[in-house]
UniProtKB/Swiss-Prot annotation:
The keyword Flavoprotein does not apply. It comes from Rhizobium meliloti (strain 1021) (Ensifer meliloti). Its EC number is 1.-.-.-. Keywords: NAD, Oxidoreductase, Plasmid. Pfam families: OCD_Mu_crystall. InterPro entries: Ectoine_EutC, NAD(P)-bd_dom_sf, ODC_Mu_crystall, ODC_N. GO terms for molecular function: oxidoreductase activity. This is Putative dehydrogenase RB0419. It is an enzyme of class 1 (oxidoreductase). GO terms for cellular component: cytoplasm. Belongs to the ornithine cyclodeaminase/mu-crystallin family. It comes from the Bacteria.
Amino acid sequence: MTRMKILTEAELRGIVPLDREAVACVEDAFRALATKAVAMPPILRLDIPEHRGEVDVKTAYVPGLDGFAIKISPGFFDNPKIGLPSTNGMMVLLSSKTGLVQALLLDNGYLTDVRTAAAGAVAARRLSREDSSVAAVFGAGMQARLQLEALALVRPIREARIWARDAAKAEAAAIALGGKLGFAVKAETDPRAAITGADIIVTTTPSETPVLKAEWLEPGQHVTAMGSDAEHKNEIDPHAIARATYVADSLKQTRRLGELHHAIAAHLMSAEAEFPELGQVIAGLKPGRTRADEITIADLTGTGIQDTAIATLAFARANAADAGTTFES
């Protein structure tokens, strides 16, 4: 007889908020990627272009952990037009010792949202100036909102600007976040105005053409690029990648999917060039920011190790809280 715990999105929201422990667990995962024999195969992705849809499958095994996660993550970006969320999905946590299913996490993409925001916080903590207090976010969806919440966990944010192609959504997000976070959040109609004087810039859009131009960047700024997780997506001007200190979540992945991919295609960067990975910066194996006036860019395409990390945290918290439903077969 095997036992499996099943957790719904509502239950997971109750036990896995976006907090400092979630940020720490994702940071530990990146460190493990740089220091342990992690097994992390390439992302499996299915594109469904006629419906602006894609499905990603990610996984990773970390030596020493009792379990590993396999995540199925659909993104259908026209769904809001018919009243549905653009992302959903689930994670399956399996035993590293037996391969048996330990938990089915029916999170509808919630855990992905949390671990992605946590990764943004890790990148900002490791690459932005410690006194960074002004943030600019491109996008007005759930991830844009969570990225700003995550930044507030690691930096003394006192002001934020939000820009999105849909000005009404940017305004709504600014109002909601200003009330929740307790500092000034303003919607901007011009993307350049949004980043002028900002210390940290986070891009969270599914754009296929750059929304952040190289000539807009100022000395000392840090950029976290979240949206380019497929070959056709491109938020950052490739010239900005060539100009800045560049850090990848997974260099093997960003050469194929991320903003680096577009800089290589534009012949601004060599496909063979070596760049630091975030885990190497965390572990002290490679430098991150070395000067206050340096422009840094973190290219985060999303990794399976983040999913295993957040699923493991969710399972531990569920057991501690006796949450979820146990299914026996």
